[in-house]
Structure formats: structure tokens, C-alpha cells
């Protein structure tokens, strides 16, 4: 079903599909190729009724340490108009939108650093379990760019609450797994060695549920959470991101 990928490790276990971010040498930083490969997997899942649960994880020491920062200035240098960077931002939004709207249940298995784009990918999953040693951060404002990746801001505010998200974004402070659970960014915190067992406790009953009921329930939850507004909110994200990175590139000259 799935081709060989350069940035993902995909394991088909019948009703469960495991998708592992596989750039451990970069902390699984998200680049354009990873986005393209994620989008290919997600679109294939839209047409596959046999998979009931997708588990998203990261190889190595971290789930994901954010977007590939080296890619942004490289794209601007190659295309000063910013069109390639806008295309990258639009691709990130498509990945997150498709992830949130899949008919099957998605589970994020989190460990190590869950930063920036990594946190964005995680919050678009239905269920999230994290190791008690995992660390979270939204560093964008501290880096001089808006929190534009993937249209994450509305989703994060809906999941964790507007007041806390305001604090975490403006201060760019790191927070631990206990705080992430308090904010409902994590549904459960377990020792790192128990992550697979925790995922299995969720996945096993889910794959026995009626798939139509699961699909309708997810649609109802997404509508309640304002998921239909993500496209509207993220309409501005690529423009903001391009402008911010362009300003940073100009200031460095």
C-alpha cells in the first residue's frame, strides 16, 4: 500500500497503521519532503477502509523538535518572492487539516521533545499519550515568527484554552508532561517504557467499534471544536510566515 519513504517509517499491522517520523539525526524536524510523504499517507488512508487506527510517533530521542529551520532561509534565497515558502506553509496546513478530518482514529505517541511543528502535528491527532519525561514548547515568537505552522493556533486554543495558549506562545516557555496533561494537550502521561502499552489500551477497543459510528462521532466532535474554521484561520498563516521570515532574512544582511 505504501511506498518506501525517506522521512517516514510506515508499518502496516492490519487495522493499525504505525507512522513514525524518521529523521532522528535532525530531531525529526519537519521539512517539505516529510510533509509531502505525510500527505501521501493520509490521502491513502482516506480511501482505505481496513485501517481503523493510525499511530503517529517519532524515531530516536524525540518525537519532533519542530520545523526544519534551515529550509526556510534556503527557500527564500532560492525564491525571494516567497512563493515557495507560501507553498510549504500551505502544505503544512493541508497535512494538519487532513489529519484532523480522517475517518479513522489517530493516536499521537509522544516522547522527548515535542516542539513547534511537532506539537502542531500532535494536537491534530484525536488522542495523545506522552512519556512523563517529554517536554513541550511553542518557540515561534521567541524566534521572531508568528505561530503560523499548519493552522495550529485555533486547534491549540480549542484544546488547551485561550488564556494558557496566550501565555505559552508569548513567553515561548517550555512545559512538562504534567502541565501538558493539565492543559489537555496530553490525555494520559505514562513512564516512557509504558507508551506502547498505553497506545494498545486505546487501540484495541477502538478497532472493534463500528467504523460508521466512529466516523460520524469524529465529524460531530470536529464540528463542535470549530474544525471547519481552521481553513479560514490558516488562510492568513502562510502570508504571516512569509513576511516574518523575510524580515528576519533582511535584518541579517
Language-model features: locations:
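CoA-thioester-processing core
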Residues: 95, 99, 115-169, 198, ...
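C-terminal alpha-helix plus adjacent terminal tail
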Residues: 1-17, 172-178, 193, 197, ...
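Glycine- (often His-adjacent) and acidic-residue-rich active-site loop
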Residues: 58-95, 142-144, 228
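Short acidic-hydrophobic, aromatic-tinged amphipathic segments that line or gate anion-handling sites
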Residues: 129-130, 188-195
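A short, small-residue-rich loop immediately preceding and capping a beta-strand
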Residues: 104-113
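Conserved CoA-thioester-binding segment of acyl-CoA-metabolizing enzymes
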Residues: 1-59
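Hydrophobic/aromatic residues within transmembrane alpha-helices
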Residues: 19, 56, 68, 121-123, ...
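Well-ordered beta-strand positions
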Residues: 127, 167, 171-173, 179, ...
Amino acid at each position: 500500500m505504501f511506498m518506501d519513504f525517506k522521512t517516514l517509517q510506515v508499518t502496516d499491522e492490519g487495522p493499525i497503521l504505525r507512522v513514525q517520523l524518521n529523521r532522528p539525526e535532525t530531531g525529526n524536524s519537519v521539512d517539505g519532503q516529510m510533509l509531502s510523504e505525510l500527505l501521501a499517507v493520509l490521502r491513502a488512508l482516506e480511501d482505505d477502509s481496513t485501517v481503523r487506527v493510525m499511530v503517529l510517533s517519532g524515531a530516536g530521542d524525540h518525537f519532533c523538535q519542530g520545523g526544519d529551520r534551515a529550509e526556510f532561509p534556503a527557500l527564500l534565497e532560492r525564491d525571494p518572492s516567497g512563493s515557495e515558502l507560501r507553498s510549504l506553509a500551505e502544505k503544512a496546513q493541508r497535512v494538519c487539516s487532513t489529519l484532523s478530518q480522517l475517518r479513522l482514529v489517530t493516536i499521537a505517541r509522544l516522547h522527548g521533545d515535542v516542539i513547534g511543528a511537532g506539537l502542531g502535528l500532535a494536537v491534530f491527532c484525536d488522542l495523545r499519550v506522552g512519556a512523563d519525561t517529554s517536554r513541550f514548547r511553542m518557540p515561534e515568537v521567541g524566534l521572531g515568527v508568528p505561530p503560523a505552522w499548519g493552522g495550529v493556533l485555533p486547534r491549540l486554543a480549542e484544546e488547551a484554552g485561550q488564556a494558557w495558549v496566550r501565555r505559552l506562545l508569548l513567553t515561548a516557555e517550555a512545559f512538562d508532561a504534567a502541565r501538558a496533561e493539565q492543559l489537555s494537550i496530553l490525555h494520559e502521561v505514562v513512564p516512557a517504557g509504558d507508551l506502547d502499552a498505553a497506545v494498545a489500551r486505546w487501540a484495541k477497543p477502538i478497532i472493534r467499534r463500528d467504523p460508521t459510528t466512529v466516523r460520524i462521532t469524529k465529524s460531530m466532535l470536529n464540528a463542535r471544536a470549530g474544525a471547519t474554521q481552521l481553513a479560514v484561520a490558516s488562510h492568513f498563516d502562510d502570508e504571516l510566515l512569509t513576511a516574518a521570515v523575510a524580515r528576519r532574512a533582511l535584518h541579517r544582511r
